[in-house]
A protein has these predicted regions:
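Flavin (FAD/FMN)-binding glycine-rich loop and adjacent Rossmann-like elements that form
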Residues: 1-178
Length: 178
C-alpha cells in the first residue's frame, strides 16, 4: 500500500450559472487577469478524463464533449450536464423562456493548491485565483470553445449573477470536495 499524502487534496470549484440566449446575442465578459496562463495550464477544454464508470458508466479514458450537442460516447453536451432549467419543460412561461445551466466542469476546477491548513492570507489568495480560473473558463466558453460546425465561442451565454446573489456571477463559496 502507498503511504497517505496529506498534500493530496481534491480541487475546488467556483461554479457559475448561465442563461442561453438567442444565437447572435453577445454577452461575453471581459478577459480576466491571467487568462492565457490559466487557459493553457488547466487547460480549458471540452475534453475530460474518465475513471472507469465515475461519469455515466463509461470506461477509463478520454471523452470529447461538445457544448450543446451530444458527442459520440457521451450522454449529452456540457450544457445539459448541470442544466437547472430546460425551457421546453415550461411552455408559455415568462419566467423560464431560456435554458439555465450551472457550470461545474474540470475547466473551472482550481487544482493549483489547497486552502486546507493554510494561513488566512494564503487562503484568500488561492480563493481569488480560483475565481479567476472560473471567470477564465466562462470567457473561454464565450469566445474560444469549439462550436459544432467549425466556428468558436458561445457569446450568447449570459451570466446570471442574480441567481447566486454575487456581482461576478460566481457562487458565494467554492464547492469543496474534501
Amino acid at each position: 500500500p502507498v503511504a497517505p499524502d496529506v498534500r493530496c487534496v481534491q480541487s475546488f470549484t467556483y461554479t457559475f450559472t448561465l442563461e442561453r440566449m438567442a444565437d447572435g446575442q453577445r454577452h461575453a465578459i471581459p478577459m480576466p487577469k491571467k487568462y492565457e496562463s490559466y487557459r493553457d495550464a488547466q487547460p480549458y477544454s471540452l475534453r475530460i478524463h474518465t475513471h472507469g464508470g465515475e461519469i455515466y458508466g463509461e470506461e477509463t479514458g478520454w471523452l470529447e464533449y461538445r457544448m450543446m450537442e451530444r458527442a459520440p460516447g457521451t450522454k449529452g453536451g456540457l450544457w445539459s450536464y448541470r442544466r437547472l432549467i430546460a425551457s421546453e419543460n415550461f411552455p408559455g412561461s415568462s419566467q423560464y423562456r431560456n435554458d439555465i445551466s450551472m457550470i461545474n466542469w474540470p475547466g473551472n476546477d482550481y487544482r493549483d493548491e489547497s486552502i486546507i491548513d493554510r494561513s488566512p492570507l494564503e487562503q484568500a489568495r488561492a480563493l481569488q485565483d480560483a475565481k479567476r480560473v472560473s471567470l477564465g473558463f466562462l470567457h473561454w466558453m464565450q469566445t474560444e470553445a469549439p462550436r459544432f460546425g467549425g466556428t468558436s465561442g458561445f457569446p450568447e451565454l449570459r451570466p446570471r449573477p442574480d441567481l447566486f446573489g454575487t456581482s461576478d456571477g460566481l457562487s458565494k463559496y467554492p464547492y469543496i470536495r474534501e
